[in-house]
Amino acid sequence: MADEQRGTDGAVRERVKPKKQDPTLYKVVLLNDDYTTMEFVIHVLETVFQQSPAEAYRAMMQVHVNGRGIAGVYPWEVAETKVETVTSMAREAGFPLRAALEEG
């Protein structure tokens, strides 16, 4: 009877455990610019987002052709860290590559 308790009216009431809610997921979006090389974008996708060379190439082409591309979808804290990592890597390499978060 660990999951039950008696109410004030003497009836046995079952404890209702709150349902665990999945965390909100955020897209990490890479934004195209005229200076960051395709090779560097592929490197970022492979190292920061653990994409295979083929996946990284496809994602890089999406960024190149459409002006933006989804690098991955993560919970807030992970997505925020990945955006900071991309920005830091790009600045250290001398590129203006930007990453953004979108709910979704």
What are these regions (language model features)?
Residues 1-104:
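Terminal domain-initiation and capping elements
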